[in-house]
Amino acid sequence: MKPKQRLRSASFRELSLRLVSELSYRDATDVLNRVLHRENRDSVKTSTMEDWVESFGKSLTEGYTAKAEEILDSYHVEKQSGIISEGASLPPSALNPELPAVIGEKQARSLITEYNRGRDRMTKLKYDDLASDIEDGTGRCCYISVDDIGVRFQKPGRKGKCKKGRSFIENTVIHIQAEGKQYTLTAIGMDKAFKLLVAFLLENRLMEDYRLVFFSDGATCIRDNIEKYFGFRQYTIILDWLHLEKKCNEFLSMGIKGSKDEKQRIKKELASILWTGRHQNAINYLDSLKKSQIRNAVKIEELKDYIRRKSPNLTCYALRHELNLRISSNRVEKANDLVVAARQKHNGMSWSKNGSGALAVITATMINGELDGWITKHRISYRMAS
């Protein structure tokens, strides 16, 4: 323990942690000193608070890692990497799950017929096997959203003016949802986050006869890690609808010309086609644009290439929407806001790796309802929260 760091009661520690997760260290210590009527030599110092929070966060991160490695070891999974390979003692229901019910051909055709009423040819749904393979929403599905969020890295001993091209610390946040319950994991480094995820799914038996559905913004590193850690069994990746729509609009804003209404019409028509999941129809639509509508043909080609690259992870968003199934990774984006962005991405802020990671894991632990157990018993339950 560093000089001036005092032993703290459980309630004092919890109050301190909740304050620093919402406020700057300066504001948090100011509130504490006002509440506790501490002044001058007896006051809580900002630097002392920051050092203690980083130390607490490091201990908490080690607690999550130790719990994960204990779980992995019990399944004979290599605990340093978390990658499931030959020799792992997983139940057959995890290795070769009996997947829950899908909507099937009859329901799919009925939904498509109803959806197509009054729509033009390009935006109509067309039945295929993929449509009938959508989960019906009543079976055992585990929805996993993965995202990275970068905060500015504070270099030690900065001199002179800040250089261009700042470095960033990447916090990986993973949100897990199943049967009305949820849990949030975070780590600096995607490999570390996925190791925690594998252990969490094993501990909660969420790989045993569960359909795994991943949502992401389409980043290659996320897709590659999903295959790296879950390639031994079934899984589905769905490209987040809001990200897809935003990305297409960005390309179109640079690639088309005309009146505001005309450009908006083109964006809306392309979105309507992609809503059905028919990526080739979307490419055909872009090919049909007149030269008078195109400002930058290179951007239109880049958009077509983007749609082709992401086509394996496009789904029939329209049918999923009709079935009240998820089409977006907005839950992990909300988790990102709570765990990282709300506290760490204000203008002018920069962070050390330990400082950023500490605040992120502390906030995630609060969201999961695990903070009291760690403060009082040094225990992580690793169980889903309602």
Predicted regions and their residues:
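Catalytic center-proximal scaffold of phosphoryl-transfer enzymes
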Residues: M1-S386
